[in-house]
Amino acid sequence: MTQKRVLILTADAGFGHRSAAEAVEAALAELYGDQCVTKVVNPLDEADAPELIRQLEEGYDEMVVEDPALYRIAYHAMGTPLVADIVEAFATRLLNDVMLRLVQDFQPHVVVSTYPTYAQPVALAIKETTQDIALAVVITDLTDVQSLWYSRAATMHFVPTSLIRQQAYDNKIPATRVWVTGLPVHPAIARETRDPLVLRDTLGWMQEIPTGLIVASARTQQMATISRLLDRAQIVLQLAVVCGGDGELFRRLQQVQWHGPVHLYDWVDNMPQMMKAADFIVSKAGGLIVSESLACGLPMIISEALPGQEVGNVRYVVENEAGTWAPGPAEVLATAFSWLKGTPPQLDAVRANAVRLGKPRAAYDIAEGVWGLA
């Protein structure tokens, strides 16, 4: 049996890039088993990665939380051709050695990149090996992406929406090298087909009352207030609050005297089950959480968004009526009330739109595309 080898490059600036990489890896394993050998690597974690560029990744969370205005300026600057060209040249120079070593060590048939600044450095590394290695780019935001994502050296761009497809065309990428697949979410979402009431029973939740899922992290600022406000509202509602590994928030919420049924979690690895058991979700507008929610047909109340790509994610959800933008606890409460208690209740219509937009099998489609390139 001839095995195919796939090297998947990712980053840890935010959750979405690694989650997309792991979704593609899981789909390849499920579809092709031992015929496919995969490796997910963050080049910036490698010992020979330059310290300067590693520090830029490590400072991402701090800048997002403590100085969003600076993040906004940096993001929009990256969207200008001159700055993008400078960043691309800078990254290519600094990452060339580590990229070349990774490719030479693993000997892949295909390299998959889920991070924008990797495309050109790995394309150069592939060229230097003089081997026939395909390069695939998986774009992890829904509407607004920087030109760094697009590489004329890439064999294929797997893009989440028709909007990104048009942007690829505008960046001189041929139509034969662009495939609209959706953003890859873990195959567990497509596999989970149990009835929501069964899932609630499995999770230890009450079965017969509406359920809101609140997803927080160290990057969110309002979820504690939102949780308390929804709990005290005159709505029959149970809450499941996932703190995303933010231990301080988890401990603080454990001290609250809750009025209704509230289930608290520090970190979970069964988000697909929770999403499919809930009636709606309150979250920020990261590409991963938006794509997972839509893949589960879960109406979204988006309470926070980073400048740049997350603003585009909000626009995508709102314009398609699969959720709403509620930038404050009072707005979140008003939306939940109208969805559950309005005349008529609006939740079913929003859910239908989320189902229409969702791409639960995107990771499988990308895996099949990658396999075809090998």
List each model region and its residues:
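Donor-nucleotide binding loops and adjacent catalytic segments primarily
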Residues: D195-A278
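C-terminal alpha-helical cap of glycosyltransferases
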Residues: K359-A374
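A short, well-ordered alpha-helix in the C-terminal region of glycosyltransferases
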Residues: Q346-P360
